[in-house]
Amino acid sequence: MFRLVSVGFLKGGNSVSTVAGIDRAARFYESTIGKKAVMAITGLILFGFLIAHMAGNLQVFLGLEVMNNYAENLHANAPLLWGARIVLLLSVLLHAWASIQLYSLKKEARPIGYAKPGNVKSSWASRTMMLSGPVIAAFVIYHLLHLTTGTLHPDFVPLRAYENVVAAFRQPIVSVIYIVAMLLVGNHLSHGIWSMFQSIGFSHPRYTPKIKKFAAVFAWVLIAGFISVPVAVLAGLVR
C-alpha cells in the first residue's frame, strides 16, 4: 500500500515538475528577452542548415556521380531526414512567429522604445527584415516544390540531383529567381547573424562593429556559394 502511494506521489511530482517547467518556459517566452532567445536559437539552427545545404550544393562541381551519390545517401536514412525536416519546419515557424511578435512590440513601444542614441541610424538590412522575411518564405516554398518534390520541375527525376539542378538552371528565368532570392537571404542573414550575437549578450561598443563585419562577410561568402551554382550552369561550366 505504502509503495503504491509512493509511486503515485512520485508520478504526481513529476507531472507537477513538468507543468511548472512548461509554465516557466511560457512566461520566459512572453518577455522580450525570451522572444529574442527563440529568434537566436532558431536562427542558429537555420544558419547551420544553410551551411550544410550549401556544402551539398557545391558537390555539383565534383560531377554527376558524386552529386547523385550524395542525394541517394541523404535519402537512404528516411527517419533522420524527416527528423531534420521537422526540426527545420518548427524552427522556421518559431522564428517567424517570434519575429512578428517582436516587430509588433517594437511598433507599440514607439517613439519611446528602442530609441537609443547609438541605434538611431539603422542599416538597410535591418529596416527590410520584415519585408524580406515573407519573400524568402515564398521562395522556400517554391524551392521545395521545384527541386525537392519536383512539382514545378517538368524534367524532374527522383534522386538525380545533378541532372535536376542542371536542367533547372539552364533556364535563365529560373536562375534569376534563385540569384535574386539568395541575395535577399544574404541581406537577411547579414543582419540576423549579428543580431543573434547581440541577443545572447555580445553587445559592446568595441566589438559590435567587428561582429557586424564578420556577420556580413560570412553571410555573403555563404550566399556566393549558393549563387555560384546557377551562374556556373548558365556559363556552361557545369553541364
Which functions belong to the PLM regions below?
Residues F2-R239:
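Membrane-embedded alpha-helical bundles that constitute the cytochrome b-like, heme-associated redox core
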